[in-house]
Amino acid sequence: DVPGHTKGLVTLLHKKGIKLLHIGVNGASALPEVPECFLWKNGDSEIVVIYSGAYGGAYKNEYIDEILYFDHTLDNRGAPAPEKVLKHLDDIRNMYPDYIVEAGTMDDFAEILWEVREKLPVIENEIGDTWIHGSATDP
């Protein structure tokens, strides 16, 4: 939900074994100039980042066969009713008839992308945040 982060986050996430960060922002946010998917490095630490200019939707990377589809409610809303979740799964199956559609975790998709991380563009810079400023925002 936050448009940018300090690269210090890379080290913190890497130390916890997190391999994938998905950043989705609302339409009013100014977007940084970064690839849709990249390997973000800070020293010896690295994570894969998927940067989306919206909440939810499909993400397909050219180096893998799988598609990640985020289907959730918008900003500051609760979880959908179970019936809506099942209907959304049916809708997604109709959109991707050649795929097996199943619920999964970010970690499931992270493991798949991690295998091709050397092929991704590399970013080693900060990703400026248009919402927060100052030294207190940098761990």
Task: Give the label of every model feature segment.
Residues 1-139:
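Catalytic-domain carbohydrate-binding cleft regions of carbohydrate-active enzymes
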